[in-house]
From Swiss-Prot:
Its cofactor is Mn(2+). This is Phosphopentomutase. It is an enzyme of class 5 (isomerase). It is found in: Cytoplasm. Isomerase that catalyzes the conversion of deoxy-ribose 1-phosphate (dRib-1-P) and ribose 1-phosphate (Rib-1-P) to deoxy-ribose 5-phosphate (dRib-5-P) and ribose 5-phosphate (Rib-5-P), respectively. It catalyses: 2-deoxy-alpha-D-ribose 1-phosphate = 2-deoxy-D-ribose 5-phosphate; alpha-D-ribose 1-phosphate = D-ribose 5-phosphate. Gene3D superfamilies: Alkaline Phosphatase, subunit A, Phosphopentomutase. SUPFAM superfamilies: Alkaline phosphatase-like (SSF53649), DeoB insert domain-like (SSF143856). GO terms for biological process: 2-deoxyribose 1-phosphate catabolic process; 5-phosphoribose 1-diphosphate biosynthetic process; metabolic compound salvage; nucleotide metabolic process. The lineage of its organism: Bacteria, Bacillati, Bacillota, Clostridia, Eubacteriales. InterPro entries: Alkaline_phosphatase_core_sf, DeoB, Metalloenzyme, Phosphopentomutase_DeoB_cap_sf. Its EC number is 5.4.2.7. One of its GO terms (molecular function) is manganese ion binding. Mn(2+) 2 binds at D282, H287, H335.
Length: 388
């Protein structure tokens, strides 16, 4: 019973890509700079799999006998956002980035949105999510108008206090925006950003929801379902793929809930793919430049590795990777264009294999398809022959 378990540590990059300067990301190194800022920092279980052995990795102890195979992957797609990264992991490479709005959205888009939802909006600026609710939260509570904002990524975000606009109504507003944002304005994601609290102490909740574009081509998940496999999704995977190519999914409250749900699915009898996204690294710490918080979240995940390994079956293939960077040590609060780590482990797979620098995240999709015996036109190159 063959299964591939892919765990994406959202934003856990490991050093600037050669084209990082084009994205304003020179010097970004999410994992390396966290270790540099915290001299005694270590991730012993990830290091035992080969984290410190990866070409170009700094700040982590190389293992003399890594349990797994290890490498790093470059992003071939144009962009550095969640959707682009996950689609590429699933074998779909984008040759042009999603549109971004450094000056806010065009007036005609905002007017169409306001007309459709029957109310005015606030904001329409690029901003940090925590800062925008500090700035406009009181006015929102007073007027009832939702807050629209964006970032350096291709996102249309709508923030609303849960007592002012009920969460289900906020989700409906997001669906409306998603239907409007097509063609040249087809942003990667529309995101619901509910918050609670009182003036001066507003706090975002875990009821965030992403409304992604449907993938523009077939992904590993589509091929897997077509071939009769189960595809189980944990976290925001279902949202990222617009629900396509997924047979069962569960949303999560935080990283540790995500690991719990992953373990539950691992204990199920099924053949196919388990795809998990753990978003706290990015959402709670990377974007907020919280080095200590990010480091603690990494340690929390690292402590769960023995549990994950203990629940692997004989034919399971485990892949741990990331979708982009979000270096909390830099001035930027946005994603960074970085290499991502690649750790691969399974009871019947070789240990201590250096997979080198892969030219695309899509090598994961090609390898998983190869392992499951799926014929596909996916991008990427399989490394199965190196590890089996």
């Amino acid at each position: 019973m063959k299964r591939a378990i892919i765990i994406v540590l959202d934003s856990v990059g490991m050093g600037e890509l050669p084209d990082a300067a084009k994205y304003g990301d020179e010097g970004s190194n999410t994992l390396g700079n966290i270790a540099k800022n915290l001299p005694d920092f270590s991730l012993p279980n990830l290091e035992s799999l080969g984290l410190g052995n990866i070409d170009g990795m700094t700040g982590y102890e190389p293992s003399k006998n890594p349990l797994g195979s290890y490498g790093r992957m470059a992003e071939k797609s144009a962009g550095k956002d969640t959707t682009t990264g996950h689609w590429e992991i699933a074998g779909l490479i984008l040759d042009k980035p999603f549109p971004v709005y450094p000056n806010g959205f065009p007036e005609d888009i905002i007017k169409r949105f306001e007309d459709s939802i029957g109310t005015k909006t606030l904001g329409n600026v690029p901003a940090s999510g925590t800062e925008i609710i500090k700035l406009l939260g009181d006015e929102h509570v007073k007027t009832g108008y939702p807050i629209v904002y964006t970032s350096a990524d291709s996102v249309f975000q709508i923030a609303a206090h849960e007592n002012v606009i009920p969460v289900e109504r906020l989700y409906d507003m997001c669906r409306t925006a998603r239907n409007i944002l097509t063609g040249e304005h087809a942003v990667g994601r529309v995101i619901a950003r509910p918050f609670i609290g009182e003036s001066g102490n507003y706090k975002r909740t875990d009821r965030r929801k992403d409304f992604s574009l449907a993938p523009v081509g077939k992904t590993l998940l589509d091929y897997a379902v077509e071939n009769g496999y189960k595809v189980k999704a944990v976290g925001k995977i279902e949202d990222i793929f617009g629900g396509r190519g997924i047979t069962e999914s569960v949303h999560i409250h935080d990283n540790m809930d995500g690991v719990d749900r992953t373990l539950e699915y691992m204990r199920d009898d099924f053949e196919g793919i388990l795809f998990t996204n753990l978003v706290d690294f990015d959402m709670l710490y990377g974007h907020r430049n919280d080095i200590a918080g990010y480091a603690n979240a990494l340690k929390e995940f690292d402590r769960r590795i023995p549990e994950i390994l203990a629940n692997l079956r004989e034919d399971d293939l485990l892949v741990i990777t990331a979708d982009h960077g979000c270096d909390p040590s830099t001035e930027s609060t946005d994603h960074s264009r970085e290499y991502v780590p690649l750790l691969v482990y399974g009871k019947k797979f070789k240990s201590n294999v250096n997979l080198g620098t892969r030219s695309t995240f899509a090598d994961v999709a090609k390898t998983v398809a190869h392992y499951l015996g799926i014929s596909s036109n996916l991008e990427g190159e399989s490394f199965l022959g190196s590890i089996l």
